[in-house]
A protein has these predicted regions:
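Local beta-strand/beta-hairpin segments that build beta-sheet-rich folds
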Residues: 55-58, 72, 98
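Short strand-edge motifs at loop-to-beta-strand transitions and within beta-strands
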Residues: 65-69, 101-103
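Short beta-strand segments within Ig-like beta-sandwich modules, predominantly Fibronectin type-III
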Residues: 57-65
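Beta-strand-rich extracellular modules
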Residues: 84-90
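Aromatic/pi-system hotspot detector in well-structured domains
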Residues: 46-48, 88
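Surface-exposed, short loops/turns at beta-strand junctions within beta-sandwich domains
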Residues: 72-80
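Primarily secretory-pathway and cell-envelope proteins
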Residues: 1-46, 93-111
């Protein structure tokens, strides 16, 4: 929905073109940051970021904004995870969704 795009960027690659890049998690990691690129969202609206449907952050996005999101707890578990970027009418999360885009990344244990 909408023209906004979210891209996950890891040392392994990006989520561009449906790719699923890996994030390697060391055994005792409590928090891991992942880089995001947000583009083509309406800049007068806030963009809400969710990881696995859990609210993580919100940003005012210009034409292209690079930021990070913190992975913690279940987000660090091995497997695929989804980042969702959403904009709502009147910046109200209970309101109508006007932009919605997702990207997937995979967490793997670091050797």
């Amino acid at each position: 929905v909408g023209e906004g795009k979210v891209k996950v960027i890891t040392p392994d690659g990006t989520s561009e073109n449906g790719n699923i890049p890996a994030v390697f998690i060391k055994k005792d990691t409590l928090i891991q940051q992942v880089e995001l690129e947000l583009s083509n969202f309406q800049n007068e609206k806030e963009t809400f970021i969710f990881v696995d449907q859990v609210y993580a952050d919100k940003h005012q996005v210009t034409s292209t904004t690079q930021t990070t999101v913190q992975l913690k707890e279940k987000m660090l578990e091995t497997g695929n995870h989804t980042i969702t970027a959403v904009q709502y009418e009147n910046n109200d999360p209970k309101g109508k969704v006007i932009s919605f885009n997702q990207a997937t990344f995979e967490t793997k244990p670091a050797s």
